[in-house]
Structure formats: structure tokens, C-alpha cells
């Protein structure tokens, strides 16, 4: 099989790299991290829209690019290499996928088109304080009241919730708390009076929010998909997000490797570069191998993440997440060890990549969660 990018994909990757190098340099990221009025650059977000990045996974009739899963992976790898702070995962990958998979034609037109234009941001409010990685564990309730629903509950660690215009909220319309049946999705105006939130930065500097809904009134027109049957959509959206995170981690790991290799070539001890010591050469090779293995499984996850066969999708995504988490931990620790104290300073770029890789490992299921899911699928096969 040929895994090389096409000419168009190489051009896309090069163009995106140049955009991020010009608009998202380390000094620019530092300014974003220090600013108090928002956790990302609105100017760069509009650059993404002008570039066509926000429309990659969407149909051309909505103004999208009609791109493939590999096109999304290429973009995510570049985001990982440049530590992009923008809510691409939250709005395009997660929110956009929920609308694409469950929305009516009117809902798609109303939400996807302005999102592609950079005029609207989405965020998925699936997690709750007690749910951890099990997004079917939902206590938030939606009660039917005439032609509308009243939603009450709390949502935790809503990625991109700090800047979202609309929230896609999971709520239980029937069934017990941890039941996969009886879940529904609703499009909720994030600025509604009965919606309150506390925005904050994750440890890598990206924005998230805790969200509380107090008897929020939502019309039936804002029900996304079929009432009581939202779990397959939530599960699929989460797999797409996990695959995207795996690709982003590959890009981040590549920069950690390159930064460490350059340091080994320039840092001198005992009269010669420390990269001349064989034990460090072997460790560097191990880091490169881990990154390559992660990239291979991330590619498989990207290709299978949009499949309707749940078992195939779960197996590919979980395998990738396990390998990426293990590789990210090994590469982060080895990179810091070979750098010494400078590797954990706030000003040096390596530490910023390590923080991002730590957040990736904890998002949408850690190693134990995905090992358990992969093991159950293997046993059932």
C-alpha cells in the first residue's frame, strides 16, 4: 500500500505549515497565554476560516472542502507541531461532527455554514462531574414541556466551552443515569440567561469551561437527531475527536524529538556534544521508533474513525490511543531527562509540548480505559 501524501495533500500541508509559522510562532503563543480576554487568537481563527481549514470535513454544499479523513489528519499533525491554541477540535471536529451526523438539513445549513465562515463556534457538553470517560453517564435531564424542553444539569470540562456560541448538550429524556438509552442532544445558546459557565485554562493553556443549566428552555427545533437515541452519535463524535487528538499528538511528539536531537548536537559536556554518547543515541532512536509507531496507528484510526461499523471503529481508535499515550509519556520523559532542568522551564518550548501531550493522554479516555475497550472487543471477536 502507498501511504505517501498526494501532491495536493503535500501542498496543503506546506501551506498550513507556513500559515502557522507566520501567525502562531512561540512569541505569539506566549502573548495568547498571557492575555485575559480570551484563550486563543480571534485573528488566527479568522485566518483559519479564510484558509478553508474550518470546512475540511464538510460537504461542499455547505461551503465546505469535502476533504477526507487524511486531510483532517494532516491538519491536526500541523496543529500539533505548532501548538495551535484555537478551538478547532471543539468546534470543527466535535461540534461539527455532531451536527453532520445527527442534524437535519435545516440545522446543518444554520450551523455548519456560519461555522465554516468563522462566524460561529460550537462546543460539545458531554462530560459531567461523575462521568469521567463514560459519556453515557448523564444526570442532566431534559423534560418535555409543550413544544419545548426544560434542561437542568451540570457539565464538566467542556473543551472550547469558554468561547462557544452554541453548546451541543447531552441530556437524559428517559432512563437511568448510566443507561446508554434515553439520551438526547440539544443545541443550546451559550449566552442564554439560564446558562452559566466558568471558563478556565487547561494545564496546556487551552480553554475549557464548567457549564450549569438551570431549567433552560429549548424549542423542539433545537433537538439534534432523534429523541432518546443520541448515544451512537455521542460515541461516534468522541471517536472522531480521539482520532484527531492522536494525530495532533504525533505532530507534537515529532517536535519534541527534533528539539531533543538538536539539543544533543549542540550541548557539550566533557569536551564534546552529548549526542556523541552512545546511550543517548540509543534513547533517541527509541523515541523516533515510538513516534513512527504512533503515526501508523493514528493513520489507521483516522481512516476508520468515520466508519459506521462500531467494532472496527472502536478497535482502531482504542489501539491508536493506547500507543499514542504510551509513546507520548515515554518521549516526554526522555526528552526532559536528556535536556535536564531547562526541559521543564516555562520559557523553553519543550515544556509546552509536554504539557499538551499530558492533556491529550487524559482526554477522551486514558490508557486503562482504551485497553479495557480494546480487550473487550478482542475477546468478543
PLM regions: where:
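Cytochrome P450 C-terminal beta-domain/meander region
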Residues: 134-152
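Flexible, small-/acidic-enriched active-site or ligand-binding loops
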Residues: 133, 137-139, 188-220
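A short, charged helix-loop
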Residues: 209-237
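Alpha-helical interface subdomain recognition
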Residues: 1-83, 102-105, 114, 118-119, ...
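A short, Trp-centered hydrophobic/proline-enriched beta-strand micro-motif
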Residues: 118-127, 169
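A short core secondary-structure module
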Residues: 148, 152-196
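N-terminal glycine-rich flavin-associated loop
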Residues: 86-106
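Short beta-strand-to-turn element immediately C-terminal to the catalytic PLP-Schiff-base lysine
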Residues: 101-103, 143, 169-172, 187-189, ...
Amino acid at each position: 500500500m502507498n501511504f505517501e501524501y498526494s501532491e495536493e495533500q503535500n501542498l496543503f500541508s506546506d501551506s498550513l505549515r507556513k500559515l502557522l509559522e507566520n501567525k502562531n510562532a512561540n512569541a505569539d503563543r506566549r502573548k495568547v497565554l498571557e492575555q485575559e480576554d480570551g484563550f486563543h487568537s480571534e485573528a488566527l481563527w479568522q485566518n483559519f476560516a479564510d484558509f478553508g481549514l474550518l470546512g475540511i470535513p464538510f460537504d461542499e454544499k455547505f461551503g465546505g472542502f469535502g476533504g477526507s479523513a487524511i486531510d483532517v489528519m494532516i491538519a491536526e499533525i500541523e496543529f500539533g507541531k505548532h501548538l495551535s491554541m484555537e478551538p478547532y477540535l471543539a468546534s470543527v471536529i466535535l461540534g461539527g461532527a455532531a451536527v453532520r451526523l445527527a442534524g437535519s438539513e435545516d440545522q446543518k445549513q444554520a450551523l455548519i455554514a456560519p461555522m465554516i465562515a468563522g462566524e460561529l463556534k460550537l462546543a460539545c457538553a458531554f462530560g459531567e462531574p461523575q462521568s469521567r470517560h463514560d459519556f453515557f453517564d448523564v444526570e442532566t435531564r431534559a423534560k418535555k414541556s409543550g413544544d419545548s424542553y426544560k434542561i437542568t444539569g451540570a457539565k464538566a470540562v467542556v473543551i472550547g466551552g469558554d468561547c462557544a456560541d452554541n453548546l451541543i448538550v447531552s441530556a437524559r429524556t428517559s432512563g437511568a443515569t448510566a443507561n446508554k438509552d434515553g439520551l438526547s442532544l440539544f443545541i443550546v445558546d451559550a449566552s442564554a440567561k439560564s446558562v452559566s459557565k466558568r471558563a478556565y485554562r487547561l494545564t496546556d493553556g487551552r480553554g475549557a469551561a464548567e457549564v450549569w443549566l438551570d431549567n433552560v428552555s429549548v424549542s423542539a427545533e433545537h433537538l439534534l437527531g432523534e429523541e432518546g437515541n443520541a448515544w451512537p452519535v455521542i460515541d461516534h463524535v468522541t471517536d472522531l475527536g480521539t482520532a484527531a487528538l492522536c494525530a495532533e499528538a504525533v505532530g507534537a511528539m515529532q517536535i519534541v524529538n527534533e528539539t531533543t536531537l538538536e539539543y544533543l548536537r549542540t550541548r557539550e559536556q566533557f569536551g564534546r556534544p552529548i549526542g556523541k554518547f552512545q546511550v543517548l543515541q540509543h534513547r533517541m532512536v527509541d523515541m523516533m521508533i515510538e513516534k513512527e509507531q504512533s503515526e501508523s496507528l493514528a493513520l489507521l484510526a483516522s481512516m476508520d474513525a468515520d466508519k459506521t461499523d462500531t467494532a472496527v471503529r472502536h478497535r482502531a481508535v482504542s489501539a491508536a490511543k493506547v500507543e499514542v499515550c504510551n509513546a507520548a509519556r515515554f518521549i516526554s520523559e526522555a526528552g526532559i531527562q536528556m535536556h535536564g532542568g531547562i526541559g521543564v522551564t516555562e520559557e523553553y518550548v519543550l515544556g509546552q509540548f509536554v504539557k499538551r501531550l499530558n492533556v491529550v493522554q487524559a482526554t477522551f479516555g486514558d490508557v486503562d480505559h482504551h485497553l479495557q475497550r480494546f480487550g473487550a472487543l478482542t475477546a468478543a471477536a
